[in-house]
Design a protein with these regions (language model features):
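Bergerat-fold GHKL ATPase/HATPase_c domain
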Residues: 1-58, 62, 81-84
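Hydrophobic/aromatic residues in the conserved F-box-adjacent beta-strands of the Bergerat ATP-binding
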Residues: 69-70, 176
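Exposed loop/turn and edge beta-strand positions of beta-sandwich/beta-sheet ligand-binding modules
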Residues: 65
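Residues that line or immediately flank small-molecule/substrate-binding pockets and catalytic motifs
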Residues: 48, 90, 122
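Acidic ATP/Mg2+-coordinating residue in the GHKL
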Residues: 73
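GHKL-type ATPase core
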Residues: 96-218
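Bergerat-fold ATP-binding/catalytic subdomain of histidine kinases
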Residues: 85-100
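A short glycine-centered beta->alpha linker in the GHKL/HATPase_c
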Residues: 77-79
């Protein structure tokens, strides 16, 4: 089992609160794009699709259909110490005068409002790929905030494979992978056509990003 990196806080209660925040998906994606701009990225790619995600519940592995979202950039990347700081719930983000920084929710809180599993994968120039995962599965099991520096076998999903492959093609960059997107899974049950639902959500994201980042989008 991978080593666990402990963090501070009151885990289960805080985690449930994070999952129930009312942030819209397009606002969450905008916050991720904002981070990429801060990292001097020239390009940001958003991948939004469906996968079979496996949850570990009471020692049993339970597959279910769910959505994932990946934001990948070609920015400067983050070293392993930086990843630990970014993913720690005690960390705070600061902005200089040129930063957009207008969303005010932070990467961790905004991501957890949409997904139960959040993975940050990053690569600095001439460096190796590092990752940290903030897993609701692990937090609920152990009732403590922890970061996984390696993935459990069932966590090596299609979404992770895509992110790792895209980063391996670049000198540097970062990817945020949101999986087990609980709010979308709940809402999709009322839709007769999943593809239409997916395209509708993607359209909301695209329109919102075009409005917020009009000076950055080509």
């Amino acid at each position: 089992m991978p080593e666990l990196i402990p963090m501070q806080g009151q885990p289960r209660r805080e985690l449930q609160r994070e999952h129930h925040h009312g942030y819209k998906l397009e606002e969450v994606v905008a916050d991720l794009v904002d981070n990429s701009i801060d990292a001097k990225a020239d390009n940001v790619w958003i991948i939004f699709a469906e996968e079979t995600y496996t949850n570990r519940i009471d020692g049993n592995y339970v597959p279910k259909e769910s959505f994932f979202l990946i934001a990948i950039d070609d920015g400067e990347g983050i070293n392993v110490d930086g990843i630990n700081k970014v993913m720690n719930f005690g960390a705070e983000r600061t902005y200089d005068e040129l930063d957009l920084g207008k969303f005010g929710v932070g990467m961790k809180s905004s991501s957890l409002s949409q997904a139960r599993e959040v993975t940050l994968i990053s690569k600095v120039k001439n460096g190796q790929v590092n990752l940290r995962r903030l897993s609701s599965e692990v937090v609920m099991e152990q009732d403590r905030w922890t970061l996984l520096p390696e993935l459990r076998p069932h966590m090596k999903t299609r979404a992770i494979d895509i992110a790792m492959a895209r980063l391996s093609e670049r000198d540097s960059g970062s990817a945020i992978v949101l999986e087990d997107m609980h709010k979308l899974k709940y809402r999709v049950g009322n839709e007769s056509n999943r593809d239409a639902y997916l395209q509708s959500e993607y359209g909301h994201i695209k329109d919102y990003l075009s409005l917020v980042f009009e000076n950055y989008i080509r």
